[in-house]
A protein has these predicted regions:
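A glycine- and charged-residue-rich anion-binding loop/surface
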Residues: 1-301
């Protein structure tokens, strides 16, 4: 919903939200910044235009994501819910399994091609029956009146029942970047995305990170990073394994000295040693080695 400022003679109100609990009644949630508000006072309402524009990009981006999911996955990927604000959107849809990396890339590509193609965004009011005949998508479980508002992006590419504000053409969105895809309950998935300048800033930050990794790993191209990282991880794992083996051998070599430090309590010999540098397998091997040195005596670890 819109935010903004309402000013009157001697007072300023910051509007934080606008809702319509019943048709024809708009309710403003606001905070009085200064002065005292009087009923019947003349006021001037000023909408935060930039915030509205950024919100429109996210809202239209939500419609485009919905259409892209339908194109890639099929009409079974129906909307289960959504949320959008300046620069950000999330979209819940019916689907029984996580999306593959190739499917996510395809959804993102379809969405950005629709943005690039600069589709005109058209809003029309029409009878509900006519909207359904045109194939306009509606929110599952939502109740609609006899006359509805239909938002079209690129004609048949996206046609939905919607009462919100939108961009004039899809290119105004700029770009769309998928962030995550996750489960939100049995049979439902969620995608999150950034649009506009937030999308650009995210991609710029990732590019900076990749450039830093390319320099740290001393490779010529970012395309070489996966192989180089896998090689480095394999070397690290081998080095850790070798180090653990050396520690075990060192302690085993000192096992005799450890036994010399055993104390006799009553008729029982007790040996206490901090083997914190060993992993579970190392502790077990050391214990078995020490037990074998006890001879015929019973040993409890």
């Amino acid at each position: 919903a819109d935010t903004g400022v309402i000013t009157g003679n001697g007072f300023i109100i910051d509007v934080q939200d606008v809702q319509q609990p019943v048709k024809g009644l708009s309710v403003h949630r606001a905070v009085v910044r200064e002065g005292e508000v009087h009923a019947g006072a003349d006021v001037v309402a000023q909408v935060d235009v930039q915030r509205r524009r950024d919100g429109e990009k996210a809202h239209s981006g939500t419609h485009i994501i919905h259409a892209a999911l339908h194109q890639v996955l099929g009409n079974e990927a129906t909307q289960r819910g959504s949320f959008n604000k300046e620069g950000y959107l999330r979209f819940d849809f019916a689907w029984n399994e996580g999306l593959s990396e190739s499917a996510k890339r395809e959804v993102e590509e379809v969405a950005n091609l629709a943005i690039r193609d600069n589709h005109e965004v058209i809003t029309r009011e029409m009878p509900l029956a006519e909207a359904k005949a045109l194939g306009a998508m509606s929110l599952f479980g939502e109740k609609y009146g006899d006359v509805v508002r239909v938002v079209e992006i690129g004609g048949e590419f996206s046609r939905e029942l919607c009462g919100g504000t939108h961009v004039g053409s899809s290119a105004e969105i700029g770009s769309l970047t998928l962030l995550t895809e996750s489960s939100v309950g049995s049979g439902n998935r969620r995608v999150e995305a950034l649009v506009g300048l937030d999308s650009f800033n995210h991609l710029a930050a990732e590019r900076t990170l990749v450039n830093q990794l390319t320099g740290l790993m001393k490779v010529q191209s970012s395309a070489d990073l996966p192989e180089k990282i896998n090689q480095t991880l394999a070397k690290l794992k081998a080095a850790e394994k070798e180090l653990a083996q050396l520690r075990r051998e060192k302690l085993q070599a000192e096992a005799g000295k450890l036994l010399e430090n055993a104390q006799t309590i009553g008729s029982v010999r007790v040996l206490a040693h901090d083997a914190g540098e060993l992993d579970a397998n190392g502790v077990r091997e050391l214990a078995l080695d020490l037990r074998s040195r006890f001879g015929s005596e019973a040993a409890v670890v």
